[in-house]
Amino acid sequence: RGIGSRVNSPAVGFYLDGMPLISKSAFNFHTYQLDRVDVLRGPQGTLYGQNTEGGLVRLYTKNPLNYQGTDVNLGVGSRFYRNVEFANYSKFSDKFGMSLAGFYNGQNGFFRNTYSGEHADKYNEAGGRLRLVAEPTDRISLNFLADYQYVNQNGFPYGMLDAKTGSTAMPNTNRQSGYRRNMLNTAFTVGFKANYFDFTSTTSYQYLRDNMLMDQDYLPQDYMHLEQRQFQNAITQEFALKGNHAVGGFWHWAFGTYFSSQWLKTDSPV
């Protein structure tokens, strides 16, 4: 059955440009301007921190030292789906580069709340990302990343099922269910290449505040609803040391240490 997880500790970790994403509430983030994705199967705790017992997914954005230019993506679809992305990659010298990117994504949805007339599953999300990369010497590399994302989406567009006809009615609730989230992830990574080993230090901070509202009676009458709020701050520190030459021609050694501190306040009915 594999390795399971409970509460906010997933069994498979996510990293963005070397920055760990701690909470599962941060996993459904918008991915854009990616350079590559690595999927590592099996336990990865030797070189990575918590939540990597079952594997690891590493996402990498474009490095401004390797890629320069301006990218703009526009998209329009049914139900007034709209998508805008932009990114600028600048290389100021052979040793310093910067990238600045942003996006907006939204759709009106497929269902309408009969009670309020509002779109029951519309959503809007937006965000921006700043990345600074410096390589002052051939041995030292510095990387700073700041990624902010905002989500505001209506949800849970459930309707009554007519067992005789097999048709489902449109949602009809007095409270519009939905989810809102503000999330900021930042990280600073220092890399050093020695003659026989590579050393990496990553310090990260994550801020997350969200609010989920559910109309649990799914009726126009106000019988039952649920509201959950989360407020989270987390910091991590990782050190990794890897040999860059095989010992005895076959053994590649590696080890690392990891520290994290998470403060989470949840306001929810139990």
Please give the residue ranges for each predicted region.
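Non-cytosolic beta-sheet module surface loops
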Residues: 4, 76-78, 205
